[in-house]
Amino acid sequence: YTYKIKEGIKWDDGTPLTAEDVEYSVKIMLCPLTNNTQIRSNYSTVIKSIELFPNDPLKFTMYAQKLHVDNKYIFSELYIQQKDYWDPERILDKISFENLMSKDFDKKIVTEKLSDYFNEFNKDDNSYQPEKLLGLGAYQVTEWEKGQYIIIERKEDWWGKFDLSIYNTSFPDKIIFKIITDKVSVELALKNQTIDVSTAIDTKTLMDLQKREDFNQNYTSGFIDRYAYSYLGMNTKPDGIERKKFFVDKNVRRAIAYTIP
């Protein structure tokens, strides 16, 4: 799968986004030393390697592990990071994709320098300090109070501000994301109009709110389809020691099924 990056996309320091940034970001996602166990398989099961084009810094080819209809969309989920900022010494340049996928990575590939690099890269501060949250979007994180709120502000010199596409248009100067952890507080905030938008409302709460005239006057609300599904998995082959064998009884499985709306 060969891609061509749109021209004119720039990092906050004015340097252009290149295919090397993409290659670096993929290596970060695939490397076993990165603290991303939960999502690494999203990429390692799809991406085999990245090939750059020396004569075109915006072009690259992704070789997939196997043929699949969704392979070409993998980069829509990739967190692209600035190589010059995170790897100025080009440490990952010395690590091939074959090395990253090697079963002997920990024994044969990892060096003290590489280990030190990832110990620094994986520090918690890199995930929360606004000055280190570098991106290509229209907004910059300016304040993050853990468990309370996140503030993002519009970049004045953003590369896409003259693009008329609706996807590249940013309106508010500042957006505050309030972290509300329970549905009762969300409902109360909507009733008191202390928030402008929420997607964290359960079905019953929204249906109750839609019965209120003041809510309908101040908010536009509705139910939308999601590209997702929910399921209940039953372990029908437990070991009988740590997991009891009660799901082997079809009547138990049937009873559980009756509890699902």
Where does each model-flagged region fall?
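Intrinsically disordered, low-complexity acidic Ser/Thr-rich regulatory segments
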Residues: 113-132
